[in-house]
Amino acid sequence: MEEKKQTQKKEICQYSKRCGGCAFQGMSYEEQLEQKQKTVKKYLKKYVKPDTIVRMYYPYHYRNKVAAAFGRLRNGTFISGTYEEGTHRIVPIESCMIEDKNADRIIGTIRGLLKSFKIKTYDEDSGYGLLRHVLVRVGKKSKEVLVVLVLGSPVLPSSGNYKYRDQCQ
């Protein structure tokens, strides 16, 4: 019991309390596996006998699909991240311990380009703005990357000018 209390104090993610994307990060990896196994068993035991969850060698940066909301602070700084659980407030996240590193870099690059391309982020309250979300999917074996821009308008202004290529290769 004492060991469990200590492992729950070790937060490796500074955003975990607000973003809700990695609910198990406050536990040791072994405890995470136990909890996930119990959950799978609880919901599937009526239908099948679930196999034991396979351990990862390195349990970080494994998430191959990353969705980021974009917004702007009152001081004009562009932010990207996830919505705080149960709200429309964006938790600004620079990098995430469970998201693919290339996906994080791509989202950071897009965030950095917003000002130079004069792109307005979508405001949920006013319904005004262009960029709502970005979805990045990374093929772990193929290394292919899919980037989806979710816009608040069917028209992408000056779309012929977007010939930027990220250095994530």
Kindly give the residue locations of the regions a language model identified.
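Accessory RNA-recognition modules of RNA-modification enzymes
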Residues: 1-169
